[in-house]
Structures are given as structure tokens and as C-alpha cells.
């Protein structure tokens, strides 16, 4: 149901253009269903034998894309194959899940050194996707890592220490005096939550956060591109640049609000029809859903996703092994 609805919405954002992205979307979805069916016949423990090979193939593909991939809108993210555009970073997400499941199935967290291997295997695809550049997908890799670490039993304090890295970076750029309070708090939590090698690992954690504090302003000024900075700033305040970087978000809100309770009907959205939102079929497809199906339509789709997530959690809980549960 979600796949078919998404095809209608993509077609709605590209009406009068003939067979466009919705057609490729539908074909890839049906091919994906077939692939899932055949993969479901393969025992996961057998698949585990090939995880290292799959990981190296994925890294090799990401390297190839960075040097010889197809460029669009200033980013080199795609491979062209038989008229279709394939984004290897999407497959890299699945690969990372498999690799992390294999690693975390064998580990029980007793000190922070057990995080090194999961962090390393996550870092390689993350950095290769980040330099394409694709900030959004690279952040997804971080979410996958944290989610799987949590599910595998990582202590809450460690999760906080990892997430605190982002706070350290923000403070370094916005309020450096706060670091004199923040970093000692992180050090105290590290010392309190570690069963072994407390002093050494606490010093390493404090050193790491101090390093993040030192390089964060440089990353913001020299590494992030202007459009990436705009996305991060305008996410909180799109009205700061209503005709520039904040235009998409503001128009999307208008489109969603104009849908009212029942919406204008599929393929009938006026803002969508008049192309008020450029490239609406990508990150802003939800605005077409809100305009054309209204509040009830967005509520239904949100409910379908909620049911899907609950079902996935149920499957993970009932899995026979930790490896299967993590996947």
C-alpha cells in the first residue's frame, strides 16, 4: 500500500512529464519484493559467511562512485545502469546493518574499547558518503550505529557519551565557555559507568571531546558546504531566508496546511501542480501527501509506518538468535 501510494505521489509531482521517476520507482519496488522473497529463503547464518566479502564490495562501490559515478545537482552519488540510476549508499545501509549485527552478536560491553570495531566499520562508509557529498545519508549511518548499539545492550551512559559529541561540537562553535563545564561532566559520567580501566579510558574520552571542541569550528568553516550549513541553520528557522534556503520548508508547510482535513484529491494539488516546490518528488514528497490527502491521509500513512515499525520490533524480539534480532 505504501509503495503504490508513493508511486501516485511521485507521478503527481511530475505530471505532464510522461513516464518519469514513478515508473522507475515502481519497477525497482517490484524487483525489490522479488529479491526479498529469494533472500528470505537463505538462512541468515549462511549469509553470515559472506558478510566480509559484501562489506568490501560495498566499500569498493562507494569508492568507484566518488571517482567515476554520475553527477546530479552537484553531487556524485549514482551509478547508471540500463537507463536506471542506482545509489550505492542505499545498499551500504543494508551492508552496515549486516556487518554490525555480526560484530555485536559476538560482544558483550564491558568497557569502551568494545566500541572501536563497530565505530571503525561504520566510519568507512560514512566518510565515503559524506564526501560525495550526501550529508543526509551519512547521518543515517550514525543513526543505524546508535540504534544497533542500543539494541545489543550498550549501557545508557555510553550512548549519552557518544551523543554528547554533537553537543560538544555545538558548544565549541556557539558557546565555548560552556565547554569548561560540559567536558568535565562527560569525564565524570565516563569514570562512573566504566567497570575497568576507569582512569585511562576517562582520559581518552576527555581527550576525544577536547579534540572535537578544537576542530569543530574548522569543520563548520572549511569542510561543510554552504548548502549543508544552510540546511542545518534553516531547519530551526526557515523564515530566516524565505526565498532561499528556507523556501522549500516554508512552501511545504503551506502545501500541507492547504490540504485541510481531506485534501484536494490525488493528482489535484494546486501547489504541487504549479511546481511551487522544486524537486518535490525527493525529500519533500510528504508535502504532496499533505496537500492531496489532507490530515486524514497523513495520519493514515503515519499509522501504517507505526504498524510496520511495531511489527519489525516484534520480529526482532521473537528472533531465535541475537544476530537475527539485530538484523
Language model: regions and residue ranges:
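Hydrophobic alpha-helical transmembrane segments of multi-pass inner membrane proteins, especially
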Residues: 3-12, 16-243, 291-327
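Helical hairpin unit composed of two closely spaced alpha helices linked by a short loop
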Residues: 248-262, 266-327
Amino acid at each position: 500500500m505504501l509503495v503504490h501510494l508513493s508511486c501516485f505521489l511521485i507521478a503527481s509531482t511530475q505530471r505532464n512529464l510522461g513516464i518519469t521517476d514513478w515508473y522507475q520507482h515502481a519497477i525497482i519496488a517490484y524487483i525489490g519484493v522479488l529479491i526479498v522473497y529469494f533472500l528470505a529463503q537463505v538462512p541468515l547464518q549462511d549469509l553470515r559467511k559472506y558478510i566480509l566479502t559484501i562489506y568490501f564490495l560495498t566499500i569498493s562501490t562507494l569508492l568507484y562512485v566518488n571517482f567515476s559515478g554520475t553527477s546530479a545537482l552537484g553531487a556524485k552519488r549514482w551509478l547508471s545502469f540500463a537507463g536506471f540510476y542506482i545509489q550505492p549508499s542505499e545498499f551500504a545501509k543494508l551492508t552496515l546493518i549486516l556487518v554490525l549485527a555480526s560484530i555485536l552478536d559476538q560482544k558483550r560491553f564491558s568497557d569502551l574499547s568494545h566500541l572501536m570495531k563497530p565505530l571503525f566499520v561504520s566510519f568507512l562508509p560514512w566518510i565515503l558518503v559524506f564526501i560525495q557529498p550526501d550529508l543526509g545519508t551519512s547521518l543515517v549511518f550514525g543513526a543505524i550505529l546508535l540504534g544497533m548499539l542500543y539494541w545489543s545492550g550498550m549501557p545508557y551512559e555510553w550512548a549519552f557519551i557518544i551523543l554528547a559529541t554533537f553537543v560538544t561540537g555545538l558548544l565549541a562553535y556557539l558557546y565555548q565557555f560552556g565547554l569548561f563545564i560540559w567536558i568535565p561532566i562527560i569525564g565524570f559520567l565516563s569514570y562512573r559507568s566504566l567497570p575497568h580501566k576507569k582512569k585511562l579510558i576517562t582520559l581518552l574520552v576527555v581527550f576525544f571531546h577536547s579534540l572535537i571542541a578544537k576542530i569543530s569550528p574548522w569543520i563548520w568553516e572549511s569542510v561543510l558546504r554552504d548548502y549543508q550549513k544552510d540546511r542545518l541553520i534553516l531547519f530551526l528557522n526557515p523564515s530566516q531566508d524565505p526565498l532561499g534556503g528556507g523556501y522549500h520548508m516554508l512552501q511545504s508547510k503551506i502545501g500541507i496546511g492547504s490540504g485541510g482535513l481531506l485534501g484536494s484529491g490525488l493528482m489535484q494539488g494546486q501547489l504541487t501542480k504549479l511546481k511551487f516546490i522544486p524537486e518535490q518528488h525527493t525529500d519533500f514528497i510528504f508535502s504532496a501527501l499533505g496537500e492531496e490527502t489532507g490530515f486524514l491521509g497523513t495520519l493514515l500513512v503515519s499509522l501504517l509506518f507505526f504498524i510496520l515499525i511495531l511489527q519489525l520490533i516484534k520480529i526482532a524480539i521473537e528472533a531465535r538468535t541475537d544476530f537475527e534480532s539485530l538484523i
